[in-house]
Amino acid sequence: MASKSVVLEAREITLAIELIELGARLQLLEAETSLSRDRLVKLYKELKGVSPPKGMLPFSTDWFMTWQPNFHSSLFYNIYRFMAGHGGCRAIESIVKSYRLYLEHVQLQDDEPVLSLTRAWTLVRFFDSGMLQLSVCRRCGGQFVAHAHDPQHAFVCGLCQPPSRAGKTKKAAQTRPERQSAVAGIPAEVPQVAEARAHEARCTAPTLDTFVTAEV
């Protein structure tokens, strides 16, 4: 009986730890690592202090079509396409790196992430199975997540044509005055400096706008 490589097992544990820290569900861990369910549960409890949540994973593509989730998902998937095409790593590693960049961009915009790691992983699986496609907005030229086989010639994204109540949530109403007062006191050159530093930290990674419109 061949003995299992200690190095490979260590890599699997490292990957599982990274996924758990990013909020992965147990089903994702089972699908992407070779560790047993019992070991994954123990690892999850050790890292999070609680048992992994139960229940089924998201299985509908409709969530990705709603207004805010759609452009967050579109941002992530365009990052993922770049990473998958140029990163030279496994699919799950591309997902992790892309998700970290997605979180970074959201933080730069002083926003909160809408897309969880499990949703991002599910999104990639939906694309791989042919259930979703990227459609090009005829106004801004950005590429956005859409149902497979939807007509593309007249597609307009939710940013160019937002629904009537887009962004009008209770939380947005509570935080808007704070954001407005904060923005009023920031010198005009600060956003450019912050973006330049973020770009330098990412080395050759594209900017936010590049991810949305990049052709791979």
Swiss-Prot record:
Q: Which GO terms describe its biological process?
A: bacterial-type flagellum organization; positive regulation of DNA-templated transcription; regulation of bacterial-type flagellum assembly
Q: Which cofactor does it need?
A: Zn(2+)
Query: Which GO molecular function entries does the Swiss-Prot or TrEMBL record give?
Result: DNA binding; zinc ion binding
Q: Which organism is it from?
A: Paraburkholderia atlantica
Q: HAMAP family under this entry?
A: FhlC
A Pfam family it matches: FlhC
Write the record's keywords in alphabetical order, separated by commas.
Answer: Activator, Bacterial flagellum biogenesis, Cytoplasm, DNA-binding, Metal-binding, Transcription, Transcription regulation, Zinc
- Domain of life of the organism in this record? Bacteria
How the cofactor is bound: the record states: Binds 1 zinc ion per subunit.
As given in the record, the signal peptide range reads none
For this chain, the family text in UniProt reads: Belongs to the FlhC family.
**InterPro entries reported for this sequence:** FlhC
Binding residues for Zn(2+): 137, 140, 157, 160
Tell me the function of this protein: Functions in complex with FlhD as a master transcriptional regulator that regulates transcription of several flagellar and non-flagellar operons by binding to their promoter region. Activates expression of class 2 flagellar genes, including fliA, which is a flagellum-specific sigma factor that turns on the class 3 genes. Also regulates genes whose products function in a variety of physiological pathways.
Q: What is this protein called?
A: Flagellar transcriptional regulator FlhC
Q: How does it assemble?
A: Heterohexamer composed of two FlhC and four FlhD subunits. Each FlhC binds a FlhD dimer, forming a heterotrimer, and a hexamer assembles by dimerization of two heterotrimers.
Give the location in the cell.
Answer: Cytoplasm
A GO-annotated cellular component: cytoplasm
